[in-house]
Regions:
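Catalytic cores of nucleic-acid endonucleases
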Residues: 55-86
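Short, high-confidence coil segments that cap the C-terminus of an alpha-helix
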Residues: 72-75, 217-221
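Active-site/acyl-donor-binding loops of N-acyltransferases
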Residues: 224-300
Length: 301
């Protein structure tokens, strides 16, 4: 099988990007520039080869050290994990190009938010979110009324999207309730948000969040930013406050399908190898954890 770094390099070169392979803190990375040539970007491919939980933890710790090393000297690298690249290749290619400023654009003011059915949300998120669909209570879709942003001359999106196209989905959990004095606080989790991978929706997250708040009147909303992708700066811009971190999650990865399955705490043997049904021959990957954000809409302690 072709090495991950070779595949990504060949893909970018086929799209017209000049690439060089360099070393950063002991890791081989891809160096390129955004489409307009104004910004350099570093891509850190992470192959998945760990045969045990212990090895996966060591690889994760080393990769995180490399990410932090790069961040102190340059911009944060784009992290591409092997399972994502191979299992969701079309989405990952489009998302990578979008990070390099090759994307189409839409503005939230030219869109409308509507409640959608679970099946429609599931289908969209399965195709366009790295973790797919997760059980939730509220499903919202962002539908294009007209497109006035620029268009990317790459991949499938070479023409304007038709009015009425579903371009983003946001989902929220049911309420978690607790008592504060004589009040009942209702807290919700913003479970998923994804747009079409080669489309940047300016103001999309904010518009969908505002609709949910107006519909449901929550006291509190929390969400997680997966550190594989970002630190969650967009949440801060929306008014959320960083509250803490969620510990890294260990996954069992099927090398035939590249599907991730979380390994539940307490299911590992003494040597660190997960003891779970169907894990024989699987590889293991531990992510970097998540940043936890919260928006308080009601004043409570």
């Amino acid at each position: 099988m072709t090495r991950l770094i070779d595949e990504i390099t060949l893909f970018l070169e086929s799209e017209g990007f000049e690439c060089s392979r360099q070393m950063r803190d002991g890791a081989e990375v891809i160096c390129t520039r955004t489409l307009d040539g104004r910004h350099s970007r570093i891509i850190l491919p992470l192959e998945i080869s760990a045969a045990s939980a212990t090895q996966a933890a060591e690889v994760s710790d080393r990769a995180y050290e490399c990410v932090e090393f790069i961040r102190t000297l340059e911009d944060a690298p784009l992290i591409i994990t092997e399972d994502r690249w191979r299992a969701q290749e079309s989405m990952m290619r489009a998302r990578l190009l979008a990070h390099l400023e090759l994307f189409s654009q839409a503005f939230a003011r030219n869109c409308e938010v509507r409640r959608i059915e679970k099946a429609e949300a599931r289908d969209f998120l399965t195709r366009n979110h790295s973790y797919g669909y997760a059980a939730c209570r509220y499903h919202y879709g962002l539908f294009l009324k007209r497109q006035t942003g620029h268009l990317a001359a790459s991949l499938e999106n070479k023409e304007s999207l038709a009015p009425g196209t579903l371009i983003a989905v946001a989902t929220f959990s049911n309420a978690r309730k607790w008592s504060k004095g004589d009040r009942v606080i209702k807290s919700y989790e913003w479970t998923r948000y994804a747009s079409l991978p080669d489309l940047r929706v300016s103001g999309g997250m904010g518009k969908m969040l505002k609709t949910f708040i107006n519909d449901v009147r929550p006291d509190d909303i929390m969400s997680y930013a997966d550190l594989e992708w970002s630190r969650g700066d967009v949440y801060s811009r929306l008014g959320f406050v960083l509250e803490g971190q969620k510990e890294p999650v260990l996954f069992s990865v099927d090398p035939r399908t590249w599907e991730r399955t979380p390994v539940k705490p307490g299911t590992t043997a003494g040597d660190g190898g997960p003891v779970i049904p169907g894990s024989a021959g699987n590889l293991f990957f531990r992510n970097f954890g998540s940043n936890k954000y919260r928006m308080k809409l009601t004043d409570y302690e």
